[in-house]
């Protein structure tokens, strides 16, 4: 009798897991409480995988031998309470991928902020150096989908291949044996605490799961000057020697790793936080024996991911930057810190109980004017309204761009870094960023 695998969730992660499980010969069923996107409907139907949407049929779920849970499904959901009560083993998609990945090198990257940029940069450096590398996880393709692709094309599944994976705390919650050869922990700041009983310690421990299966000879690289990492750090019991990155790695516009210095003045990364992201990526490339000349070439040619301090255009002497991914105060702190010119700051959206006080010194020093973009801007007015700076409210990207243009002078920067979620006016942060960019280009056309 075939092993029955039930997948909860039908997005990139769930569908990738379902397709891999079907290829492995399992009896597979996909259940999603929401709607199944057309793209994934087609993939599931073509593979002959039964699925349901907008409901969870418990009789079809609780007869599973094993359940693969998509990372967005909380443990407190009704379906997970029922699954746990039944005692069914639960794993995540990256655990399934790891079981069947064969010989390879896995680089796993986590942190509250900077995961995507560091993942993309690490991948870019390794690819520029000519290594056999793929990227995925929480960005791009699911790990399971990439493993399936290797199983379907055995000639590419060589032992020298490298997977660079962005992994979230939600994904790490559901690993059992997943073991990266190189693990990176960039930072920890309070986020997603509703999933962790509002406990920062629980959230931090979820992040530290990235190294829980590592052994002697593996590498665990972490931020050695992050106070929350320091507070909750526990030395691994496996003989693994953690490798902290200390302050002082970035001096006079260059980064030193080993005996090599890498010039950061010629690339497209801005801000101290991105210098830290860069040193992490360089460390990985160095460990994997990438040619230093090629590492420098990769640093020179890398373009930051969309919506992350993304330069939109320079018009009339004003630089427009899209940092729509700045959905929390910590991200926006780094964005403002990276500004070298007087800044018109577009901020606001769906507030997540933000404390804006850490931004105050930067706003006082760097911001010329504040443009609120949201349905309810009361907390932003409360935080910054007493400053001797213009502050206006707008209700759309087009209106915010028009208002910002009125304040900006040649040599200034207009920065969209909202410090808030996007769901009051936009579908998501990508929609917010693209509407902003469209409005900027229309204004300057």
Please name every model-derived segment.
Residues 27-33, 220-224, 346-347, 366-375:
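Short internal beta-strands
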Residues 28-32, 134-135, 164, 416:
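Short beta-strand "acidic-cap" motif of Rossmann-like dinucleotide-binding folds
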Residues 3-4, 16-24, 132, 265-367:
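Nucleotide phosphate-binding/pyrophosphate-handling subdomain across enzymes
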Residues 1-92, 96, 238-241, 290, ...:
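N-terminal leader/targeting and accessory segments in enzymes
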Residues 3-4, 22-23, 58-62, 71-224, ...:
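Phosphate-binding loop of NTP-binding sites
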Residues 40-42, 357-412:
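C-terminal helical cap/extension that packs against the catalytic core
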Residues 11, 34, 139, 225-226, ...:
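Residues in the short beta-alpha loop(s) of Rossmann-like NAD(P)-binding domains
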Residues 12, 74, 113-117, 275, ...:
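Residue-level detector of alpha-helix initiation sites
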């Amino acid at each position: 009798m075939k092993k029955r695998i039930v997948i909860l969730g039908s997005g990139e992660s769930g569908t990738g897991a379902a397709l891999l499980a079907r290829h492995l010969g399992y009896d597979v069923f996909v259940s999603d409480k929401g709607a199944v996107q057309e793209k994934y409907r087609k993939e599931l139907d073509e593979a002959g995988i039964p699925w349901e949407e907008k409901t969870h049929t418990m009789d079809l779920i609780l007869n599973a031998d094993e359940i693969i849970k998509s990372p967005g499904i909380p443990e407190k959901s009704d379906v997970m309470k029922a699954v746990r009560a039944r005692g069914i083993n639960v794993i995540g998609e990256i655990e399934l991928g790891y079981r069947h990945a064969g010989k390879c090198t896995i680089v796993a990257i986590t942190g509250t902020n900077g995961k995507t940029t560091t993942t993309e940069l690490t991948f870019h450096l390794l690819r520029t150096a000519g290594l056999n590398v793929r990227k995925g996880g929480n960005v791009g393709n699911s790990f399971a989908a990439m493993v399936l692709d290797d199983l379907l094309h055995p000639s590419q599944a060589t032992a020298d291949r490298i997977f660079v994976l962005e992994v979230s705390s939600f994904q790490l919650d559901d690993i059992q044996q997943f073991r990266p050869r190189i693990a990176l922990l960039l930072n920890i700041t309070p986020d997603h605490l509703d999933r962790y009983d509002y406990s920062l310690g629980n959230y931090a421990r979820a992040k530290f799961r990235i190294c829980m299966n590592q052994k002697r000879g593996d590498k665990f690289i972490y931020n050695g000057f992050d106070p929350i990492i320091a507070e909750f750090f526990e030395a691994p019991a496996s003989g693994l020697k953690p490798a902290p990155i200390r302050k002082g790695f970035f001096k006079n516009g260059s980064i030193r790793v080993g005996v090599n210095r890498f010039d950061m003045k010629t690339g497209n990364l801005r801000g101290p936080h991105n210098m830290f992201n860069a040193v992490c990526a360089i460390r990985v490339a160095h460990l994997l024996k990438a040619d230093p000349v090629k590492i420098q070439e990769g640093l020179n040619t890398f373009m930051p991911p969309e919506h992350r301090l993304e330069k939109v255009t320079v018009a009339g002497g004003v630089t427009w930057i899209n940092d729509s991914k700045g959905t929390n105060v910590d991200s926006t702190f780094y964005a403002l810190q990276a500004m070298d010119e007087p800044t018109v700051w577009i901020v606001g959206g769906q507030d997540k109980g933000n404390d804006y006080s850490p931004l105050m010194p930067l706003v006082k020093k760097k911001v010329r004017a504040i443009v609120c973009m949201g349905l309810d801007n009361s907390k932003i007015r409360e935080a910054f309204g007493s400053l001797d700076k213009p502050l206006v409210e707008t209700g759309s990207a087009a209106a915010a761009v028009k208002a910002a243009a009125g304040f900006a002078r040649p040599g200034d920067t207009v920065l969209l870094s909202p410090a808030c979620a996007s769901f009051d006016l936009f579908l998501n942060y990508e929609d917010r960023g693209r509407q902003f960019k469209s409005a900027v280009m229309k204004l300057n056309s």
